[in-house]
Design a protein with these regions (language model features):
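Divalent metal-dependent catalytic cores for phosphoryl transfer on phosphate-bearing substrates
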Residues: 1-121, 125-128, 134-138
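Long, compositionally biased intrinsically disordered regions
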Residues: 28, 106, 118-119, 123-177
Length: 177
């Protein structure tokens, strides 16, 4: 349910782009950010109209927290070093339960992993660590009861599941399978 708002502008989201054409190429980074942020508001509206329970709607609201929309921020920062990060952040709120934080981590890692070229054990391990560490550093989980032990376990599970998805097998030193 967390991404149902993408249905309002599907072609602006990578997972729905079936051709080489990217509509973001024809608009400014600031316009792109507004469209991307809008999927959260559209999702909330669609969910409310469909009678989705408020508890689920809270997950829609928090699944990006106040994360930086890094691709467009970095693109714009090259053109204008005076830009403000706040203009390139989701509006929040940040997750306020462990379950909401888990959805944020899973969504971020899953989406970003799709961009990996030839994923292998090391790339997946590094990617999961980097993405979740950025969220921790950015204080995305400050409103929920999430421990460092929880985060470590979540990272391990995500790494294992992603390796299963990409069918990455353990390499045996003696050459046997």
């Amino acid at each position: 349910h967390h991404d149902i708002g993408k249905i309002s502008n599907p072609s602006f989201f990578t997972e729905n782009q079936l051709s080489e054409q990217n509509p973001h190429d024809n608009i400014t980074s600031k316009e792109s950010v507004e469209i991307i942020k809008q999927h959260v508001l559209d999702g909330v509206k669609l969910a409310k109209n469909a009678g989705v329970p408020e508890r689920i709607i809270e997950f829609i609201k928090t699944h990006h927290g106040t994360n930086l929309i890094g691709y467009f921020y970095n693109k714009e920062a090259k053109l204008d070093p005076e830009i403000k990060k706040v203009d390139f952040r989701y509006d929040g709120p940040k997750p306020f339960s462990v379950e909401m934080a888990l959805v944020m981590m899973c969504d971020s890692v899953e989406a970003a992993t799709k961009s990996l070229d030839k994923p292998d054990n090391d790339k997946i391990d590094s990617f999961v660590e980097t993405i979740i560490d950025k969220q921790v550093e950015d204080q995305q989980f400050e409103n929920c009861e999430l421990t460092f032990k929880n985060i470590s376990i979540i990272k391990s599970v995500l790494k294992e599941k992603l390796k299963n998805i990409y069918h990455i097998r353990v390499s045996y030193s003696d050459g046997s399978n």
